[in-house]
Amino acid sequence: MGNANTKESRGDDSGRRGLHSALDAGIGSSTQSGRESSRRNRNTRHDLTGLLGRAAGGSSSHADERHERKETKQEREARRLEKERVARLQERERSMKEEHVDGGYLVTMGTYVGPEDFNKQIVRQLMIERKLAPFWRGLNDFDENWTEPQIIAAARGLPIPAAGETPPDELIPRPRSPASPTDASSNTNHLTVPIGGRSLSTASEHSTSNAGSALPSPGSGKGSSSPFKPTRGKAIAAVLGGGSCRNGSSTEIAPREIMLPNDPFVNGQPLEVFLYKNATECPICFLTYPPYLNHTRCCDQPICSECFVQIKRPDPHFPEGHNENDPNNNPEESAGLLVSEPACCPYCTQPDFGVTYEPPPFRRGLTYAISPLALGSTSAAMSSESSVNSGSLSPGVASPGGRRRNQSLSANAPNVVLTDKVRPEWATKLQAARAHLARRAAAATALHTAAFLMNNNESRALRSRFGRRNTGGSGSASATPGNGDENRGTGPATPANAGATANTDRAAGSSGNGNRRSRLEDLEEMMFAEAIRLSLAAEEERKKKAEKEEQKEAKKREKEREKAEKKAEKAAAKAAAKQGGPYEASRSGHSSASGSSLSLPGLSFGRKRGNSAASNLRVEASVASAMASTGAAMTTPAAPGALAPDSSTKDKGKAVDRSAGAASNDASARPIPSPQPMAGPSHLRQMSSASSASSSAVESNQGSYVPPSNLQDPRGSGLSLGGRSGVSEDGDEQDRDPSTSTEPMFNFRSLAEVVGVSIEGEHAGKRLSQINADGQAIEGEDETAKSGEGAGEHVEHVLDSQTTGISEQDSEINSQPPRLTVTLDSPATSVGDVSTASDSKHVGNETTVEHATQVTL
């Protein structure tokens, strides 16, 4: 189409360039030969430019070209596209001025600005054959009330004049003047050109249905001897033979194009008015065209040629999302090859999109030449004037206003033009894409194969260091895998076994018949061994990760448990503090008998109901019975569900050291502590020196101290009277008061011997002088009962509430006051082996006691 002129000019330029190069080469060769002859006598090196046939000044030009920057591929492609665009614009302008088909054009009008990748030569041939509508000029606006000059201006792309304005001369068509019959006869003699015995193509035979309109008018104003004016693309089509395969014969060339006489009228109307007076709109681009448009073969919908040539097959792609249950499914799709489906109709989406065209009832512009045989078989020739006055049309052409067809046409119909016909290179593109994909797959396979082979060779080299070499014998070759298995051990050695088996097969084949295993089998074995190795490695990695996760979870659970225990201890301490009141706030969680009234002076907490010396004497005298009961409590385990007395019900101060959460083995196992001097001032009055436990501690006999190993001895004293008021529930040593001590202070055996009281056996707590005096003991018990009723408030329980698991006998002993109760009225008993200096310090001696005023806290 438009590339013919460019190719011709390019050919001329190449011819000139070849001539100049030949002349330059000749001049250069002659000059160089002179130089060579002049230099032969000097025995110098021949100039290489003479051997290469270069000119004298060519060296400098090529030296300059070396320093020029090379053009990249992108720049070269952009330059090529720009050249094609400029050439296309020039060709469009030339074709629109010189060529047309029935008032339409053979080049696009610029509706779509994208690349024109359709075959322009095929489209040109189809339009000249009247199988495809020409590229009509589309109108953006059209008014049915336009006058003829306005329609002509719009069809030619000129400014539309006003309705009442006088149109310019160029918009007024002028009929041709009648010519002489001699001119007509002379033109008739030159109608045909000898074709040389070749047969016309089928397309050309179909295009001669209206042969009468192809005759030149007698009034032709051309001065040429022949009415036929060959176009520039005719020679190219004849030489290249591009239409040979498309016309059904491999030996034919494209038919010769001829230009019909220029007649600006059709049935007495201007050509533009005849075309655009009944204009229609394209449903795709929404431009107004003449009613002679293409119609789809399936649904008979109008479509312009510019929209039709833009519809094409999709690019080659993988068959994803296609209907696999379709019985017409292509087997190539199941093979995973690239596919390219035919284009579908834009209206009804039916595949194999194609169009048909019904040309207008006249012929103007280009057409193909006809043979004399075809011309003789047609009817008598009609002139253009007779065709203007004639109301009958050619028999083979249907009127566009006729009845529309109500059924679709086959894709193989002769008058159907498919999208694949204007783009015949789709099959080539598909094959190229498949070949490119195959090359990429082959390259990837080669890379993977090389990687597997390298890994396999390295693994075999490593195994050969530890195994026995194969010397070629079948016995040694068969013995090698066994040795290798023994060296490898009992681990998962399946990949090594596979490699050893392959090695054995190769050795046996090379020593025997020389048959080797195929490359595909080796590759499969290597892939199998690699897969097993990767699987084992993945399993080991998974186990390591699982072990790490388990360790993390265990540490996390341990931390959470410790936090929960600390929170529970804090909550229990807070609850005990709230339940016991202000006197319970400083108590330790390890409460025991050390919180009894014996430890009140040292611990500095609790309530003391009796402040008199008599109450102190009672407490001091009841030590023996308390020790006996403590020993029983140590041997008998405490009940786990022992309940402490409620502080709300017993609010008289008798349950000083009883807490709800103090049921522990440590509390029951500890002996009763002895009192110590108070750490600070107290509101209580000073106790008597005769009844004070502190004075006994100062003047106790030498050697009465019991080491820590005798702490659990019921005959020894308990813990020190130093309070554990500041000790936390967990019993940390750092929270303990350093002024206090847990070492025993007294030996109650030596104290009892000095005092004269028995602390063992059935008569524990009795004086030695009163053991045989039953009456005096009974009388002492009566007095104790009477004094217990009156002064019961001064008796403090020694055992804690956690010793609820003690037997009934021990509980009865603990609930009753001791058998020997020393009161203010009891007479002092003299002991013979006791010095007078220490009599005043022992229990039972007369002592002047100052009665202190009782203070209630």
Swiss-Prot record:
Compartment list: Cytoplasm
Organism (species): Neurospora crassa (strain ATCC 24698 / 74-OR23-1A / CBS 708.71 / DSM 1257 / FGSC 987)
Compositionally biased region (Low complexity): 49-61, 209-230, 384-394, 476-504, 586-604, 621-645, 688-697
Keyword flag Cytoplasm: yes
Family statement: Belongs to the SIP5 family.
Compositional bias annotation for Basic and acidic residues: 7-16, 36-48, 62-81, 545-572, 648-657, 783-799
UniProt protein name: Protein sip-5
Main location: cytoplasm
Any one Gene Ontology cellular component term annotated for this protein: cytoplasm
Domain of life of the source: Eukaryota
Role description: May negatively regulate the snf-1 kinase.
